[in-house]
């Protein structure tokens, strides 16, 4: 009797092992790269759908990184090529004395463009990593905006653009440096993409939803079809005139990340 029980126990063990392998085999054979293409147990569908979403998110992040790297390489190469070209011509003595100042100005502008681009990339990297170590404090948005408008006055004067700030003093608990970057970038865009003899109006005040800064201008505007992409890095609505306006294509990305940080 004891021998029969032992035999039955051994048979039960091997039967359970065989049955388990049969049940688990479809799971082992899953294509984890394309989980929804697998034909398996219905109970696994929610798990496979979640895995598919994660795979798509990872792929999107990977594509964004590749695109960002390609854009950075292109944006860095363009001014460096110009600087190298102008410098080589001057080095070889191929510039007339009366053109030296012109070439020097072009080299300076390209160098400033390069510096601005690197600074913007560093700012975005810090915001991405949330490594901004500055403490939050009460910031008077009205006074901050007046300072920013004052800094932009020379740039606005080149196109005879009138800038004005209206509203009232309003405190906001945030990181002053980031708030400065956000408001500055929006106001600078309002100047860059404005028309001659145009106007930029900024309103600062309290609303039912809290403190608010509104910027309006008489500029060329942004076509509706571009609205969803204007916060993407290096995205420009008018690529043909981006260089002459001096933008890096990162300003609104900094605004977006600054807003998310707050």
How would you describe each model-predicted region?
Residues 135-150, 163:
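A conserved beta-strand-to-alpha-helix junction within the catalytic ATP-binding
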């Amino acid at each position: 009797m004891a021998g029969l029980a032992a035999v039955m126990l051994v048979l039960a063990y091997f039967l359970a092992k065989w049955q388990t392998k049969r049940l688990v085999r479809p799971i082992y054979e899953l294509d984890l790269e394309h989980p929804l293409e697998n034909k398996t147990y219905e109970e696994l569908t929610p798990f496979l759908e979640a895995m598919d979403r994660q795979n798509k998110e990872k792929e999107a992040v990977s594509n964004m990184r590749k695109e960002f790297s390609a854009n950075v390489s292109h944006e860095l190469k363009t001014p460096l090529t110009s600087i190298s070209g102008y410098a080589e011509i001057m080095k070889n003595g191929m510039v007339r004395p009366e053109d030296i100042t012109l070439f020097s100005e072009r080299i300076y502008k390209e160098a400033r463009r390069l510096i601005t681009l690197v600074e913007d990339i560093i700012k975005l990297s810090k915001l991405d990593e949330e490594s901004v170590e500055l403490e939050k404090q009460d910031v008077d948005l009205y006074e901050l905006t007046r300072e920013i408008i004052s800094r932009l006055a020379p740039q606005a004067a080149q196109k005879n653009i009138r800038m004005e700030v209206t509203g009232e003093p309003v405190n906001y608990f945030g990181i002053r440096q980031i708030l400065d970057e956000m408001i500055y970038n929006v106001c600078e865009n309002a100047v860059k993409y404005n028309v001659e003899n145009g106007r930029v109006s900024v309103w600062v005040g309290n609303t039912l939803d809290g403190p608010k800064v509104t910027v309006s201008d008489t500029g060329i505007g942004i076509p509706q079809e571009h609205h969803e992409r204007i916060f993407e890095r290096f995205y420009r609505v008018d690529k043909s005139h981006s260089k002459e306006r001096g933008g890096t294509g990162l300003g609104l990305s900094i605004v977006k990340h600054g807003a998310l940080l707050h």
